[in-house]
Amino acid sequence: MKILITGTAGFIGSHLAKKLIKQGHYVIGVDSINDYYSVSLKEDRLKSIGKENFTFNKVKLENYDDLSKVFVDEQPEVVVNLAAQAGVRYSIENPRTYIDSNIVGFMNILECSRHFNIQNLIYASSSSVYGANTSKPFSTSDNIDHPLSLYAATKKSNELMAHTYSHLYNLPTTGLRFFTVYGPWGRPDMALFKFTKAIVNDQAIDVYNHGNMMRDFTYVDDIVEAISRLVKKPASPNKEWSGADPDPGSSYAPYKVYNIGNNSPVRLMEFVEAIENKLGKEARKNYMDLQPGDVPETYANVDDLFRDIDFKPETTIQDGVNKFVDWYLEYYKK
């Protein structure tokens, strides 16, 4: 199968490309390789994918003409849209970047998918869409009308836009609400990377909300395993869906949203301890208030994921952290 992945030079995208190629698929990579963080890290991720059954296109999603040319030239059957401007905190200071990448860019993905008869569009949403919701665990049937950051608002917008195209054009769309993904080749702006780097270099780490936080950390291999199964399972209409009692996570149209999380929140200080255990070194800690746009806890209900693709992420936090630290020390030769 020919599968187009946007964000192929990114953290999840590079892992997914390797997974799908190993399964025998042909992967068409798309990425702008912007400088939001280390360009060399992105280029090294691309190198790690190799060249067999893989082609790469340096394209910005905001440029419809360039993007549509990739669809014309490569004729993909499935699209996995992982390209986005990431980061809750960054969105507060750089809002326009999020509109360009996450709204305009996704609109172009939808248009290309519609015009080039894509059989299955899978796209990254985010656990941040749950915003002010405090019911736990977070369920795709929950209301998500109160986002706490522009990043979260753009991700909810993506889900609404996808539903519109599923309704109007019968385009199968599947949105994936990722919960705090971590692992080798991770982004430098994410907690695991920042904490590991700081501890290795004898620098203090910033611990938000004075350590009173919980995250449903999800190992990257579990994320890509779920996506690889969903590649073969396009969204289909929910025959039991009712407009009188609408389920936000499905539809009468070929539209579905899943949580992909570990279904097992970990306390932030336990996460820090896992890094300390692996490095054999205690962190110096700066305890700070909760940051704007952040939430104190995330917790994924993954019942429908297990029901539909017989998969539930299960990598333990210590195992996942160990694999990241091993990669970090090797990559930076510490």
From Swiss-Prot:
EC numbers on record: 4.-.-.-
SUPFAM superfamilies membership: NAD(P)-binding Rossmann-fold domains (SSF51735)
Organism: Staphylococcus aureus
Cross-referenced Gene3D superfamilies: NAD(P)-binding Rossmann-like Domain (3.40.50.720)
Phylogenetic lineage: Bacteria, Bacillati, Bacillota, Bacilli, Bacillales
Protein family membership: Belongs to the NAD(P)-dependent epimerase/dehydratase family.
GO molecular function (one): lyase activity
Listed pathway(s): Capsule biogenesis; capsule polysaccharide biosynthesis
Gene: capI
Protein name: Protein CapI
Biological processes per GO annotation: capsule polysaccharide biosynthetic process
